Structure formats: C-alpha cells, structure tokens
Amino acid sequence: MAKLYAVGDIHGSTAHLTRLVETVPFEPEDRIVFIGDYIDRGPDSSGTVEFLLSFRERFPKCVFLRGNHEEMLENFLNGADGCMGDAYITNGGGETLISYALNPLGKVKAADFPEGHLGFLFETALTHGEDGFLFVHAGIRPGVALEDQSRQDLLWIREEFFTHEHALGLTVVFGHTPLRDVFQNPPYAIGIDTGAVFGGMLTCVELGDGKILNAYQV
C-alpha cells in the first residue's frame, strides 16, 4: 500500500539528504512531498539538486514544492526588485552560487547553471493537497480561503500562521520556520523544518489519518 511522506527543508545539506534516503523505507509507489528550500545556506546546493533529479527518476510520484529560497533565486536571476545586489547573496544565495563554481560578486545568468537544474527549481508547485493534508512551504493566512491565499504568505508567513487556528478543514504541513523538533498542533498544523542546515536534523514524516504515523530524523 502506498504511503504518504513529507520531507523538510534541505538547504543544500546533501549529506543529510543522502542519510535520510538510506534510512526511510521509501517505495516507488509512495507519494513523497518535499516542502521546498532545497538550496541556499548549506554547502552543496548543486549536489542536492542533482540528487533530487536522480531521486525523482526512481520515485516518480514525488511532489516538489517551491520554497522562498527558490523564489529568491528566480527573482535574483530575473533582476526583480528586492533580490538585487546583496539581498539574495547575503540570505544564503552566495553558498549556492559557489556550489555551482560561480562568483557571487560577478554577473550571474541562468545559462551558467547545468541543464535541468533551474527547470527543476522553478517548476515547483506552491501547494499540494492529499488525504486531508495541505502541503505548503511556509503556511497559510488564517481566516483567508485557500483560493485567496497570497503567494507572499504561502512562501514567507511564520508565527501569524502556526500560532493560530484556522478553518480550512485540512492539516497544514509546512517547513520554512526552523524549530528544534517537529511542531504539532492537531488538527491544524505540522511543522517539519528542524534546522538541518543550522546544526539540527533533517526530518521526514509518514502521514495518515490527519497525524504523523512515523518520523525519521538524521
């Protein structure tokens, strides 16, 4: 029987990701939802993306959500306001560029990245709903209907979401805000960013019946 999993923020921590995949009994038919922030801050963003591309071939039912760091990289490459100059670089983007052998102080363009990497990062979804769960990188704005949620909130919201109840009728599984352990506020929210890049653990949870069935941390 297929299982439902969610994996927290990786942030270029390929070593954590490799150990996690060796630990969790994933099967090809399982749904595995990655919560976003594959890049930035950690030492090996390029290796993480390459690993996930290969992983997707073996586990085709994966879902990859967009995190705010994928959003920042896209804005940086497009020259969008708010992510010019040092803004992206100082928020962990410098480590990503270095992992691709690019100079953070130089001119960087999309063509400098390996084929398929940016497509993978930028074709990510904002949300995924399944089996009574809503998966999203940062969270939702309580009191706002799902179809009216802003992109900003889905990618960036923090305490305004997970310290409050909501009326979506779904358990929201989120990352983005690094916490010392898995956050549980049933039936409203489950937080799975446990700060792998900050010396914490990388977390994967198996989900069902509105709750965590099993948790794996490396």
Q: Positions of the model-derived regions?
A:
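Beta-strand-turn-beta hairpins that frame and shape the catalytic cleft
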Residues: 1-4, 128-134, 186
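Short, well-ordered beta-strand micro-motif
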Residues: 129, 135-137, 204-208
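Divalent metal-coordination and catalytic microenvironments
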Residues: 9, 37, 52, 67-68, ...
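Active-site environment of divalent metal-dependent phosphoester hydrolases
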Residues: 11-15, 40-43, 71-73, 142-143, ...
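Conserved beta-sheet core of the metallophosphoesterase superfamily
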Residues: 144, 150-216
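N-terminal active-site segment of His-dependent metallophosphoesterases
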Residues: 1-51
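Divalent-metal (often Zn2+) His-rich catalytic cores of metallo-beta-lactamase-fold enzymes
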Residues: 71, 78, 134-149
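Active-site neighborhood of divalent metal-dependent phosphoester bond hydrolases
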Residues: 41-125, 161-163
